[in-house]
Structure formats: C-alpha cells, structure tokens
C-alpha cells in the first residue's frame, strides 16, 4: 500500500498542516496515483490557479515486483515553472524534469514541488506500507 498526503503551502501558511488531503493505492503492479491540477486525472489535486504545477505533475506507479516509483512528468512547456525535491530521512535530492526515481521499499519521505517565482509549494508525503 502506498499512502500519500498533500498540503498546498503558500508563504503566509508555512508550517501549517490545515487542508491536507490523502490518497492511497494497493501495491499491485500497474497501480497509479497522480498529483496535479486536473481533478479528472489526479487523486491529489492542487489549486487550479497554481500554474507552476502541471495538470498532471507527479505520477506514482507500482512496478511488477510491488515497489513504487515516482516520475516528474514533462508538461507542455520546455522549461518547468517549478523545482521538485525528494527528501528521505536526512537526505534530499533534486528530481529532474521528466526523471523517474524508485521510492524506498517500506519507507517514507516527501516530495516538494516548489514554485520558482513565489514562496509557495506543494508538499507530498509518502509512506510505503509493506
């Protein structure tokens, strides 16, 4: 099971957890969870006017062995309006535009989608239950 929590945070709300949303999916091959502005495609939906987030921004996909990966999907623009970082424990790393990374099996962490022009972000926490 992969559990996701999401909080949309703007400068004045930094540190607040109000308005968190959650989604989960069983660890079955082909299971998918998406994060973005499109409520028809995404289980976790960001504010519609936050254009630094694509319609479908992040895709979590369960592989054939029950492990999960996340992809920062390429949008319609050649250069993204945001940056994405993956934090697991005390280690944080940037996630490249269009890149895919495996999530730790049985682990937890956070993906931060940071607007490049304003102090706001979308914080997506994950927990992979074994």
Role assignments for model-derived ranges:
Residues 43-44, 50, 57-114:
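Forkhead-associated
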């Amino acid at each position: 099971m992969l559990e996701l929590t999401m909080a949309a945070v703007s400068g004045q709300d930094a540190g607040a957890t109000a308005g968190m949303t959650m989604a989960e999916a069983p660890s079955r091959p082909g299971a998918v969870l998406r994060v973005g502005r499109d409520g028809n495609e995404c289980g976790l939906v960001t504010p519609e006017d936050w254009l630094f987030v694509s319609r479908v921004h992040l895709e979590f996909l369960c592989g054939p062995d029950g492990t999960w990966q996340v992809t920062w999907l390429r949008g319609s623009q050649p250069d993204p309006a945001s940056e994405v970082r993956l934090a697991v424990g005390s280690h944080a790393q940037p996630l490249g535009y269009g890149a895919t990374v495996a999530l730790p099996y049985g682990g937890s962490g956070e993906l931060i989608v940071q607007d490049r022009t304003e102090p706001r972000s979308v914080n997506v926490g994950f927990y992979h239950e074994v």
